[in-house]
Amino acid sequence: MDPNCSCATGDSCACASTCKCKECKCTSCKKSCCSCCPVGCAKCAQGCICKGASDKCSCCA
């Protein structure tokens, strides 16, 4: 169980404007959680809730 999430890691969970679940998918907003979302990252900006800003983003490399 993720201490920051009400679901087991990998399971579905509800989210608001932020995602603290490491590997959870958000069901309430139908978006995935991005671990890093630097400003100007089009791939991260679409269809995901950002957990935090970072210059190192695997989905924007």
Swiss-Prot record:
Q: Which InterPro entries does its entry note?
A: Metalthion_dom_sf, Metalthion_dom_sf_vert, Metalthion_vert, Metalthion_vert_metal_BS
Q: Give residues annotated as binding a divalent metal cation 4.
A: 33-34, 44, 48
Which residues are annotated with the PTM Phosphoserine? Answer: 58
What does the similarity note say? Belongs to the metallothionein superfamily. Type 1 family.
Q: Which GO terms describe its molecular function?
A: metal ion binding; zinc ion binding
Q: Where does a divalent metal cation 1 bind?
A: 5, 7, 21, 24
Q: Where does a divalent metal cation 3 bind?
A: 15, 19, 24, 29
Instruction: Tell me which residues bind a divalent metal cation 6.
Output: 37, 41, 44, 60
Question: Matching SUPFAM superfamilies, A to Z?
Answer: Metallothionein (SSF57868)
Any GO CC annotation of this UniProt entry: nucleus
Per the record, the domain comment is: Class I metallothioneins contain 2 metal-binding domains: four divalent ions are chelated within cluster A of the alpha domain and are coordinated via cysteinyl thiolate bridges to 11 cysteine ligands. Cluster B, the corresponding region within the beta domain, can ligate three divalent ions to 9 cysteines.
Q: Whose protein is this, by species?
A: Bos taurus (Bovine)
The protein's job, in short, is:
Metallothioneins have a high content of cysteine residues that bind various heavy metals; these proteins are transcriptionally regulated by both heavy metals and glucocorticoids. This isoform may play a role in regulating the transport, accumulation, and compartmentation of zinc in the hippocampus.
Q: Provide the alphabetized UniProt keywords.
A: Acetylation, Metal-binding, Metal-thiolate cluster, Phosphoprotein
Q: Where does a divalent metal cation 7 bind?
A: 50, 57, 59-60
Residues recorded as binding a divalent metal cation 2, renumbered to this chain, are 7, 13, 15, 26
The record ties this protein, via PANTHER family, to: METALLOTHIONEIN (PTHR23299), METALLOTHIONEIN-2B (PTHR23299:SF38)
Please state what the protein is called.
Answer: Metallothionein-I, hippocampal
Q: Does the keyword Phosphoprotein apply?
A: yes
Q: Which residues carry this modification: N-acetylmethionine?
A: 1
Q: Where is this region: Alpha?
A: 30-61
Residues engaged in binding a divalent metal cation 5: 34, 36-37, 50
Give me any GO biological process, just one: intracellular zinc ion homeostasis
Region (Beta) residue ranges read: 1-29
